[in-house]
Curated annotation (Swiss-Prot):
Pfam families the UniProt entry points to: NusB
Source species of the chain: Cronobacter sakazakii (strain ATCC BAA-894)
Assigned protein family: Belongs to the NusB family.
Keyword Cytoplasm among record annotations: no
The protein's name in its UniProt record: Transcription antitermination protein NusB
Alphabetical GO biological process terms: DNA-templated transcription termination; transcription antitermination
Function, as annotated: Involved in transcription antitermination. Required for transcription of ribosomal RNA (rRNA) genes. Binds specifically to the boxA antiterminator sequence of the ribosomal RNA (rrn) operons.
Lineage: Bacteria, Pseudomonadati, Pseudomonadota, Gammaproteobacteria, Enterobacterales
GO molecular function: RNA binding
NCBIfam families to which the protein is assigned, alphabetical: nusB
Superkingdom of origin organism: Bacteria
Length: 139
């Protein structure tokens, strides 16, 4: 699958996770509704599904990975930033096939597209601190 299709999968995952985080609906329902309503012809749908289910299933674990590196309480984190960080931390901790720098750079780009004005700097700061602990020898 092309890198652009994976990038689109991540973009879609941010949107779907944002919806899930706010609605607290079942993740399978969020996935179904998202795929039914969005144009996903240029999306790696299998990767989108993996990100969505992986982040939802491991959200407590992923939140635990980010907490020590947050400059504020987890509850004060914006929903977009939380979704972006969860995706990156999922890729870093559960997807060894995704290079270290790719996971971080993709998260920064997602934060630029979907986040508040300086959220990409915040995301970069958190991942810069967390990533070496998650993948100590796999930069």
């Amino acid at each position: 699958m092309k890198p652009a299709a994976r990038r689109r999968a991540r973009e879609c995952a941010v949107q779907a996770l944002y919806s899930w985080q706010l609605s607290h609906n079942d993740i399978a329902d969020v996935e179904y509704q998202f795929l039914a309503e969005q144009d996903v012809k240029d999306v790696d749908v299998m990767y989108f599904r993996e990100l969505l289910s992986g982040v939802a299933t491991n959200s407590g674990y992923l939140d635990g990975l980010m907490k020590p590196y947050l400059s504020r309480q987890l509850e004060e984190l914006g929903q977009v930033e939380k979704a972006v960080l969860r995706i990156a931390l999922f890729e870093l901790s559960k997807r060894d096939d995704v290079p270290y720098k790719v996971a971080i750079n993709e998260a920064i780009e997602l934060a630029k597209v979907f986040g508040a004005e300086d959220s990409h700097k915040f995301v970069n700061g958190v991942l810069d601190k967390a990533a070496p602990h998650i993948r100590p020898n796999k930069k």
